[in-house]
Every structure is written in structure tokens, then in C-alpha cells.
Amino acid sequence: MTTQPAFIIDVRSPLEFAAGHLKGAINIPPDRIEQAIGAIDGLERTSPILLYCLSGARSAFACQVLAQRGFTQAKNGGAMATLLLNFERA
């Protein structure tokens, strides 16, 4: 198992998230990332953040948004299926 980053963000839709997600992940769809990111307790601009979705496209967009907002440790984890090789499913 890989050591989990401090924050795991699933940027899929709430329906996709409800169907299954990585253990410890929170759900913030890409169209809400700018508004919701500031409401996460303990999150700082230097906090490690792993974002993922179904294919990696939405998480790439969300990573770009966070980088533009000064989050220096936001990483695109890509596709959920790939991450399941190293992380637990909730």
C-alpha cells in the first residue's frame, strides 16, 4: 500500500462518488472546486492533494485550477482504476 496524501479529492459527480470511491476521499466536482476548496479544514496551499476521476481529464482540469490558485502540491492521480492498485476502496 502507498502512503496516502493528506487530502484525496474525487472530482467525479456525486452519483459516481456514491457508487464507489477511494477510502478517505472527499467529493468536489470540478465545477465547484474553486468555491469548495477553501472550506476544507486544515487544507493549506502547501498541503499534499491528490485529485482523481474516471479517466484523469476532470482531475487534470481541477489540478490546473488549484495550481492557478497557488496550491503547489496538487497532483493529478488520474484514473480511479489505476489508483485502486495502491489505495483502498471505501
Region locations from a protein language model:
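Rhodanese-like catalytic fold shared by cysteine-dependent sulfurtransferases
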Residues: 2-7, 11-48, 57-90
